[in-house]
A protein has these predicted regions:
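ABC transporter nucleotide-binding domains
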Residues: 3-8, 13-189, 194-208, 212-214
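Generic structural signal for individual residues within well-ordered alpha-helical segments
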Residues: 77, 99-100, 115-118, 170, ...
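Alpha-helix boundary recognition
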Residues: 65, 78, 198, 222, ...
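Alpha-helix N-cap/helix-start and coil->helix boundary motif
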Residues: 12, 96, 120, 194, ...
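ABC transporter nucleotide-binding domain
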Residues: 174-263
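Short, charged/small-residue-rich alpha-helical element at the C-terminal edge
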Residues: 227-300, 307
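Short, Lys/Arg-enriched, disordered terminal segments
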Residues: 1-4, 302-307
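Generic alpha-helical secondary structure signal
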Residues: 19, 111-115, 170, 219, ...
């Protein structure tokens, strides 16, 4: 039996001869939160739709619970809850009344399932507030309550914090983590917001232009970040000449803002400062630093697009 609850093998999607997702190999472990991170248009939603069999892949395979999704979708899909696009709730009904309609359509025992799912996301069963009066955060909560109402083993959530204010984001993040730690759900969540994925995910896949660039646990990704000496000098070009001529330093980079990152950690900082001052170069800042996850993501995706 595979250790992965969801696995994709060479998953590919083409539209009019152009690939939106290319040869994707995801590995999602049971009882963990997997964050699919990428800029808008990177292929996150398309990937989730293929996993859920909502759209056909052009090539490749989706394996869920050790079985082919294409061959066994009728058996697999009832064990999955999802939020890909906002459900069509009735604006003039309460949250509970809306869920009752969906429960009846799906043949779910109403009261207990609805009450438990609402409580799980912090909404009240007897609340008389209409859906049209809900805040964005409450609407997202209700959508996730609908996704978990049938007690699925897997949750697939596409950008669940999109459009929320900071309080709403924190609330949604808290109960998603609760679903994993207390209920044992396996959760696949997508986002273009790095800081949120960093706060919630156990494992991260980085997708860009439909290609999976990296897949690691959050802990491993943090360990991959480089330590360096940050140098901000009045004249970066002259400072670089000192590094090369006086200290034989070759392993460095110069940022667009003039900041110099020195990756040779054997360099003695006081000696460097003394030499720079002797050359008439004012030192504004020098200290040991470590690349953040944002630095790493920008480096492998080639720049902007991830908040």
């Amino acid at each position: 039996m595979s250790e992965y609850v969801i696995e994709t093998k060479g998953l590919t999607k083409e539209y009019n001869g152009k690939r939106s997702v290319s040869d994707l190999n995801l590995h999602i472990k049971k009882g963990r939160i997997y964050g699919l991170l990428g800029r808008n248009g990177a292929g996150k939603t398309t990937t989730m739709k293929m996993i859920l069999n909502l759209i056909n892949s052009s090539d490749g395979e989706v394996i869920v619970f050790g079985k082919s999704m294409k061959k066994h979708n009728k058996e697999i899909l009832p064990r999955i809850g999802c939020l890909i696009e906002s459900p069509g709730f009735y604006p003039n009904l309460t949250g509970t009344e809306n869920l009752k309609i969906f429960a009846e359509l799906r043949g779910i025992p109403k009261r207990n399932a609805i009450k438990e799912s609402l409580e799980l996301v912090g909404l009240k069963y007897n609340d008389k507030k209409l859906f049209s009066q809900y805040s964005m955060g409450m609407k997202q909560r209700l959508a996730i309550a609908l996704a978990v109402m049938h007690d699925p083993e897997i949750l697939i959530l596409d950008e669940p914090i999109n459009g929320l204010d900071p309080i709403g984001i924190a609330e949604v993040r808290t109960f998603i983590r609760k679903l994993c730690t207390e209920k044992g759900k396996t959760i696949l969540i997508s986002s273009h917001i790095l800081s949120e994925i960093e706060l919630i995910a156990d494992d991260i896949g980085i997708i860009d232009n439909g290609v999976l660039l990296e897949e690691e646990s959050l802990e491993e990704l943090k360990n991959m970040n480089k330590k360096y000496i940050k140098l901000v000098a009045h004249n970066d070009s002259k400072a670089v000449k000192v590094l090369e001529a006086c200290f034989n330093i070759k392993n460095y980079s110069v940022e667009k803002n003039g900041t110099i990152k020195i990756y040779d950690l054997d360099l003695v900082i006081p000696e460097l400062v003394r030499e720079l001052v002797n050359e008439g170069i004012a030192v504004e800042e020098i200290r040991m630093k470590e690349d953040t996850l944002e630095d790493y993501f920008k480096r492998i995706t080639g720049g902007a697009g991830i908040a």
